[in-house]
Swiss-Prot record:
This is Small ribosomal subunit protein uS7. The gene is rpsG. One of its GO terms (biological process) is translation. It comes from Psychrobacter arcticus (strain DSM 17307 / VKM B-2377 / 273-4). One of its GO terms (molecular function) is rRNA binding. The keyword Protein biosynthesis does not apply. Part of the 30S ribosomal subunit. Contacts proteins S9 and S11. Belongs to the universal ribosomal protein uS7 family. Disulfide bonds: none annotated.
Amino acid sequence: MPRRRVVATREILPDPKFGSQTVAKFINHVMSHGKKSTAERIVYGALETVSQKRNIEDPVSFFEDVLENVRPMVEVKARRVGGATYQVPMEVRPSRRTALAMRWLAEAAAKRSEKSMALRLAGELNDAADGKGNAMKKRDEVHRMADANKAFSHYRF
């Protein structure tokens, strides 16, 4: 984090199939070891599976709705005051909300037990759309932590 000037955010090129920057960013989250074509195959396969299962014409809008479900509104940050560390609830900035939601979806999908990663991701997207699944559980856990520590909100930065 530089002290002098604000670093410009990098523009991400939209994905080739849907032309969506959101999907392109999610592909980058799913990608491991630089294997982008494999990550694209996984994400496109998952969106295809979900759109067939739910009879959806526009999988991108469905994906954005799922992301909206998983996005956290508040989180806790550790703040040291007078020798004690408090978990202070803070509002999450929009770019971090999206990044956290994508990270949680990818991690939750990787932990599932379906056969292929595309099927795991499809299952997790389906569950998140219904308000279930590990990604939603993670979001609720973060919200619960923030709610439990509401008493320390006056220690905001």
